[in-house]
Amino acid sequence: MLLAVLLLPVELSAQSRRDKEQTYVLDQPYEVTKITPPQGKKIKNVILMIGDGMSLMHVYSAWTANRGKLFLDNCQVVGLSKTYCANKLITDSGAGGTAIATGQKTNYHSVGVDTEGRPLKSLVDLAAAKGKSTGIAVTCRLWDATPADFCCHNKDRDAEAEIVADSVSYTHLRAHETRRHL
């Protein structure tokens, strides 16, 4: 009986949270400018944008909140990819980013390597090999799993010191290659 009395306030508190309406209303939508690409020109650049945790539901929620308009709608090409990992049902950004960066599945927590831990070539590597200028722009740390998938190689995304060292050597190597091409 005492236990029931002690749990009653917790249950009532939880019930009141469930009854509370959970909505977000954007008082004024963000203005979205329509961008029209020039006609008849060959496409010269590719920009791959990866939003962290950006599922279709997240995009749809943002689109709905902004009354059916997003800057993303200006993108000429939008794609989906299945980024599940090789050894687990649910992926992480290390394995998921590696799938995007290299086109190959890898193990959970791996960054830029195959299932045996061997380095994989990324889109950045392939473009650079064709003499294209490349770059990685981030709003997080470069050694965070998703950007690291494009320029680093490690079986453990948490091995930050090794990944930082790999990114520094990669950046130095790429700078040397760029100077050589000039």
Label every model-predicted segment.
Residues 171-178:
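Conserved small/polar residues in nucleotide/adenosyl-binding loops
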